[in-house]
Amino acid sequence: MKKNFIVLLLLLGGVLTACTNNEENSAEEDNSWQNVEEEGQLTVATSGTLYPSSFYNDDNELVGYDVDVAKEVADRLDVDIEFEEYNVDGQISSLQNENTDFAANDFSLNSDREENFLLSSPIKYSFASLIVREEDDSGIASLEDLEGKKAAGEPNTSYMRAAEQYGAELVTYDNATNEQYLTDVANGRTDTVVNDYYLQKMTTEALPDVPVKILDDVYFNLDHNGFLFDKEHEALHEKVNEVLAEMKDDGTLKEISEEYFDADVSEKPDVENIEQVDVE
C-alpha cells in the first residue's frame, strides 16, 4: 500500500510538472503577429525628417523609401499602418518599450544591432560617404583627414562612431532636417556629414543651391539596411520577412527604390574601392 502511494505521488508530481511547464510555455508564447492581426494595425517608428527614406512631401504626406516599403508590407498583411515619429534614440526606445512594432528609418543591419534587435532581411544596400564644402572639400581628402574636423549627425549612429574613431569632433543634432545639416557644413559650423551614400546623393540633388558635395572616391563600409524589431517578436519578424521576400521577387522593392533613389538599391552596388572600417 505504501509503495503504491509513493508511485501515485510520483505520477501526480509528473502531471503537475507538465502542467507547470505548459503554463510557462504559454506565458512565454510570442503573440506579436497575432496581436497585430487582431488589432488590424502595424505601428511603426520613423523620423519623418530623413530624405528620401522618411519625409513629408509637398502635400504634407509622410512618404519615402522605408515608409513606402512599410506601407506595402501592411497592405499585403491586410492591416492598417500608423507611424510614430522620433529621433533615432526615440525609435530605439519605442521598440524596447514595445510602443511600436518595428522601426523603419534606413537602419544599418550591423552586428551591434543584431545583439539587441531582430533584423529584417535587407531592403537596401549602400555604403558610407562624406558631404563636404564645395569650395575646399572641407580640407578632407581621406578618412584620416577627419581628425580635428567637426562631423555632424545624430548621436549613437555607426557613422558618427566611425568619424569619432578617426578623431573627428562630433556635433550632434536631434532629428534635424537635411537642409540644416547641409547648410551648417556650407557655412562652416560643421565640416562634414558622414552618412549613407544614396541618402546624401538624393539630398544634395534636392538642395542644389547649398554649396556642398559628396567627396569623390572616399567611400567605406558596404552596408545593408532594413527594419528593426524587438528581440522577442519573432512571429512578427518572420511574417514581415516573408512579405519582403515576395516584394523583392516580384520587383516591388526595385520599383519603389527607383522612385526615390533613381537606382535599384535592393541589389548590391557595383562600386570599387570601398574601404572597410571596423566601427567599435
Residue ranges and their predicted role:
Residues 21-27, 158-171, 212-215, 244-280:
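Ligand-binding clefts/hinges and TM-proximal coupling segments of bilobed small-molecule sensing domains
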Residues 15-18:
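C-terminal motif of bacterial Sec signal peptides marking the signal peptidase cleavage site
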Residues 20-22, 67-76, 226-265:
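Extended ligand-binding regions for polar small-molecule ligands
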Residues 48, 125-132, 206-242, 263-280:
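Periplasmic-binding protein-like
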Residues 93, 107-115, 162-165, 187, ...:
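A ligand-binding cleft/hinge motif common to bilobed small-molecule-binding domains
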Residues 83-93, 138, 156, 172-187:
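Short helix-initiation/N-cap motifs at beta->coil->alpha
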Residues 27-106:
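Extracytoplasmic small-molecule ligand-binding "clamshell" domains
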Residues 71, 80-145:
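Acidic, polar ligand-binding/catalytic clefts
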